[in-house]
Swiss-Prot record:
GO terms for cellular component: cytoplasm; nucleus. Residues 1-38, 236-266 are annotated as: Disordered. This is WD repeat-containing protein 37. It is found in: Cytoplasm; Nucleus. InterPro entries: G-protein_beta_WD-40_rep, WD40/YVTN_repeat-like_dom_sf, WD40_repeat_CS, WD40_repeat_dom_sf, WD40_rpt. It holds the Pfam family WD40. It comes from Xenopus tropicalis. The keyword Transmembrane helix does not apply.
Amino acid sequence: MPTESGSWAAARQTKQKRKSHSLSIKRTNSSEQDRPGLQREMLEGQDSKLPSSVRNTLLELFGQIEREFENLYLENLELRREIDTLNDRLAVEGQAIDGAELSKGQMKTKASHSTSQLSQKLKTTYKASTSKIVSSFKTTTSRAICQLVKDYVGHRDGLWDVSVTRTQPVVLGTASADHTALLWSIETGKCLIKYVGHAGSVNSIKFHPTEQIALTASGDQTAHIWRYMVQLPTPQPTADTSISGEEEVDFSDKDENDGDGDASSDCPTVRVPLTALKSHQGVVIAADWLVGGKQAVTASWDRTANLYDVETSELVHSLTGHDQELTHCCTHPTQRLVVTSSRDTTFRLWDFRDPSIHSVNVFQGHTDTVTSAVFTVGDNVVSGSDDRTVKVWDLKNMRSPIATIRTDSAINRISVSVGQRIIALPHDNRQVRLFDMSGVRLARLPRSNRQGHRRMVCCCAWSEDHPTCNLFTCGFDRQAIGWNINIPALLQEK
């Protein structure tokens, strides 16, 4: 995960810079006698420092390439003419054969061949038509059950994490590579608080269970605890964002800067944390509160996770054992349990229920980086990986998963709803899919040229009790999105 802000913008600027300095060559159909004129035309306006001999050699090579393409084009035209002639001849011969008397063997052979062709044609047509009907039905159903409600736009770089407060008023928090964390009004999409205390990418954000305090992890090798006070604005009527099936077209190259105003420029700013946790020697990739909110855990690229006392900022435990960088950490909602994920293809369960000793269990089952592992209500852990799978584990039987979900793209920071235990999967390929704990696919969030994410989706977060939006997603297209998932209808379609 990049630690410097502007990483996506820098990549775009570099790409544009390379494009502006690329050699411009005009397409022309010219003979050998026209080559000097062609050379002059191609070199017009070019501020080249190459010697004349080198330029002439390059132009001659380009000329040879052009001639080869011309020859291929002519050969292609000739082949097309021959194919058309053969098709016409076959049509005439087929009509003549149909009018002639055939022997029993010939008739059997022809009938078998014709039947096979007809069967194959019908099969292909039926399969394509059925696929379109099913795809259209699924799209319509998903759109009715999963509706986009609000876009949260204001960051200047990609978003790594999204979270919802557990206290009133309920607000949305986002962590971005632009070195800031923002708090948003869920109803209006207005930025309420801007935190600028970090000197690196803000990689995660989590809220205190009982107070208006946030915990953020950063690429500056620290985690910050900071207080916020928000007053919600009056919600305004929102326009209908639903689209018809005919408009469900993927314009994936649409620039993420389109309509991208600086919504955070006029919101109150918090610059100094209450405390900073500074024991790591590498990027702090994630952080979370232990139950009760008196301790916090952090995960770092230095291959360790640290447990801190929030009041004193003192390091209580350093959790070692992972062989590679950590990618995520998560705490149990009601027990003193922590799960850490790593690039070493494992995740580990740390038990702090006994103050005198903490135990650790290693979960092995993935073949690539474990991007996140989260607790569910009960005795389950759900893990997601770059190996394109999600696995559901029973804490009482850690040898093998009880369910495996196989997908077509790497999975990032997953979220499991509390009530119905629905797993939300954010993908590298810009999709967000919903599954149940048995691995049954429930829905795919709609995505088109008018709505949805246009870049990698990094994180999902459920907020089931909110009346407007009960699922949030964020991605590297610099925006967070609030969705309304009709959970009863979703489960009824199961």
